[in-house]
């Protein structure tokens, strides 16, 4: 087992550029173009979203931790860089990926229990979820991944940096939600775990600052002022402020320059708000209710100035580190694009398109 990410097979063999990843997928589709034409599928973000939801259904029945689910999601991504999805039964693959991930994350489940619970979740798929089928698919997964099963996750980096950046519990919880969501994108195949963790921290701090500023403005304009809600959060202005903070620190006598910041951040229109996941919406709603019930002196702890100082401290640290800030920014843009993509996601359509080729091909 690799002691760290830098010596791991994940870094050597399972990180690609966007162009390399697109080329791999195109190569798989080119092996049988008629199959691709006959059974069109949604974009990968929609497929990942669907697979994530299905895994969570199984995880709930088997009390599986998020760490194992995250590893299973990475297994599926790796597998489908080498195998065309239309030649598989994705439900069987995801069940097997969960079973294998639980072994690797030291919470093994008996294959009989996995098969039994999977049949309860997907009764129409019962013939494909027999023990023998899962066992056979497990060997297929291991073979296609060249037995390289160690997955380094960004959660450890987030936990290690929580105290360094003085992240409040709410900051940490929000950053974790972004990490959970990034598994529904291509990011685990594109960037190192620490880069993704730092991007999640940045998004959490930006959103928390936006929330604190909105609450402060609403309190100052209670008479006739519009009430600020936590769901219509615009990230463009926050990311712009973050870039300016890093650039300003780099120009100070004690700061070190950061060439990665010389390229401008691609921003969306400043009046465009991004839709958060239902879990994040519920979390923000609960946080807002808690804030309304606090005493005035407690509310002051979440002042915009305090949240801004966190972001500035984080930006200062980045400007003096060797972190690839451009890669971080790209991670945040991928997540933003994912949230935008969710607005057009339709679970029923995605399920029907998958079931269509599975049934037609007898998978």
Swiss-Prot record:
It holds the Pfam family Cyclin_N. Residues 265-276 have a biased composition (Polar residues). Residues 53-143 form the Cyclin N-terminal domain. GO terms for cellular component: nucleus. The keyword Ribosomal protein does not apply. InterPro entries: Cyclin-like_dom, Cyclin-like_sf, Cyclin/Ssn8, Cyclin_N. GO terms for biological process: regulation of transcription by RNA polymerase II. Keywords: Activator, Cyclin, Nucleus, Repressor, Transcription, Transcription regulation. The keyword Nucleus applies. Its main location: nucleus. It is found in: Nucleus. GO terms for molecular function: cyclin-dependent protein serine/threonine kinase regulator activity. Residues 277-298 have a biased composition (Low complexity). Residues 252-312 are annotated as: Disordered. Residues 299-310 have a biased composition (Basic and acidic residues). Belongs to the cyclin family. Cyclin C subfamily. PANTHER family: CYCLIN. Component of the SRB8-11 complex. The SRB8-11 complex is a regulatory module of the Mediator complex which is itself involved in regulation of basal and activated RNA polymerase II-dependent transcription. The SRB8-11 complex may be involved in the transcriptional repression of a subset of genes regulated by Mediator. It may inhibit the association of the Mediator complex with RNA polymerase II to form the holoenzyme complex. The SRB8-11 complex phosphorylates the C-terminal domain (CTD) of the largest subunit of RNA polymerase II. Component of the SRB8-11 complex, a regulatory module of the Mediator complex. This is RNA polymerase II holoenzyme cyclin-like subunit. It comes from Pyricularia oryzae (strain 70-15 / ATCC MYA-4617 / FGSC 8958). The gene is SSN8.
